[in-house]
Regions:
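Nucleotide phosphate-binding/pyrophosphate-handling subdomain across enzymes
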Residues: 2-10, 20-30, 243-343, 358
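Short beta-strand "acidic-cap" motif of Rossmann-like dinucleotide-binding folds
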Residues: 33-38, 137-138, 160, 392
């Protein structure tokens, strides 16, 4: 079902945040009759109402499926919801917003997935394409919905598309010309149910690839689906230039981006220019300021244990004051506690703070139960000395106290900039 087939169809969009809003817009433009649903009864949907979208907010009712030909699901909507399960039981196709975009766009897609490093690698690849003078758009989980490019992207542009596991749940025809898997580590187990199910979803990026496509995977990674040409990368690869962004994990990201860019036909001179000048993205091991010799680093995007471990490893020669906690993802925190060096300290906040505190104390790490971010910043700033690092890398989601990880990182930045 492409653009022509959507005309006259009755399509239900489930979830009307950023991705759902973009999907509804493009569906209306394709001539579909659009029904929009979101459980948030106070959601601002005036723009959709002006487009003629039939809106239903609040209570989820299966009756909304009557007469529906297609369901488009936003990434934040779990598969076990009433409407999604009801659609499957009725044989109604369920697409992700990414699937809708992939069907409506003819541009070559460079897809990037993985547990950690997706946004940094996607934005770095955007910088590589621009350094080569090649038209490019960066979209997907990185911020701009893929469907928002329909009708606006240049015909010859590549699309670098960051793909989360949520976005890969309901894809059928997505075929990235180049697909990149950075890593797979435990995350979102509360959504997927098991690590195996999570990993299987990540690997869907390769399922539809053909022999003339390229799959970029970590060195030594196991079997993958699809028939694409396989290219491997590792953090010790020889690169066209050393990346400006610090940390061994970012060298891995740079190696993956280099392999992907070469697969897209970009030369090493442009890759080198981007590696030397790309400064990274906010909330990923971002230096906020240095005050009296203490560096304050915002890694609010460190929403799982694996990401926090990478952040800790970025400062091997500094005493760390690490702010941890938030809404956990059913992970064990003992491996994180074991990564603390002698002299490091933890400051725990949020719903999962106590669980993290117990793991740290068992490992002999000093812990301050701060509960809130402002208290944690105050306590860590008071304890830190010159050459120390105060690091926000929570190893948890933010939703218990903040709208999202960006809001948490912004709050940390504001608190740090207020320190005198």
């Amino acid at each position: 079902m492409g653009r022509a087939e959507l005309a006259g169809r009755r399509v239900l969009v489930v979830g009307l945040a950023r991705s759902g809003m973009a999907a509804a817009h493009v569906l209306v433009g394709a001539g579909a009759s659009v029904v929009g649903y979101d459980q948030n009864g106070s959601l601002e949907v005036g723009r959709l109402r002006e487009l003629g979208v039939e809106l239903h907010l609040g209570r989820e009712e299966e009756r909304l499926l009557q007469g529906i030909d297609l369901v488009v699901k936003s990434p934040g909507v779990p598969g076990e919801t009433v409407l999604v399960q009801g659609a499957r039981q009725r044989g109604i196709p369920v697409w992700s917003e990414i699937e809708l975009g992939a069907r409506l766009l003819s541009n070559p897609i460079l897809g990037v997935t993985g547990t950690n490093g997706k946004t940094t690698t996607s934005e770095l690849l955007g910088a590589v394409f621009r350094a080569a003078g090649r038209p490019v758009e960066v979209a997907g989980n990185v911020g701009r919905p893929l469907t928002s490019l329909v009708g606006s992207v240049a015909d010859d542009a590549w699309i670098v598309c960051e793909l989360s596991s949520f976005q890969l749940e309901d894809v059928e025809t997505l075929e990235p010309k180049v697909g990149v898997l950075l890593n797979i580590e435990p995350d979102h187990l509360d959504r997927h149910g098991s690590f195996d199910a999570y990993a299987e979803t990540k690997l869907r990026i390769f399922e539809r690839q053909a022999a003339d496509d390229t799959a970029v995977v970590p060195r030594g990674f196991g079997p993958i689906p699809g028939t694409a040409r396989r290219v491997e990368f590792a953090g010790d690869d020889e690169l066209p230039a050393e990346p400006l962004i610090p940390g061994p994990h970012n060298r891995e990201n740079a190696a993956a981006a280099t392999a992907a860019a070469r697969a897209a036909g970009i030369g090493d001179d442009a890759i080198a220019e981007a590696l030397r000048t790309f400064e990274g993205v906010p909330h990923r091991i971002e230096l906020v300021r240095e005050l009296r010799g203490v560096r304050y680093v915002n890694d609010s995007k460190g929403t799982n244990v694996a990401a926090a471990l990478r952040a800790l490893a970025s400062f091997p020669d500094s005493r760390l004051h690490v702010i941890l906690g938030g809404l956990g993802k059913n992970e064990a925190y003992e491996p994180l506690a074991a990564a603390f060096k002698a002299g490091d300290a933890g400051y725990v906040i949020g719903t999962t703070g106590e669980k993290i505190a117990r793991a740290l104390e068992t490992a002999g790490v000093p812990v301050t139960r701060a509960e809130t971010l402002d208290a944690a910043v105050a306590a860590s700033a008071a304890a830190a000395e010159a050459t120390d690092v105060v690091l926000l890398s929570p190893a948890c989601a933010s939703f218990d106290q903040f709208r999202d990880f960006e809001a948490r990182g912004d709050a940390f930045r504001a608190l740090v900039l207020e320190l005198a």
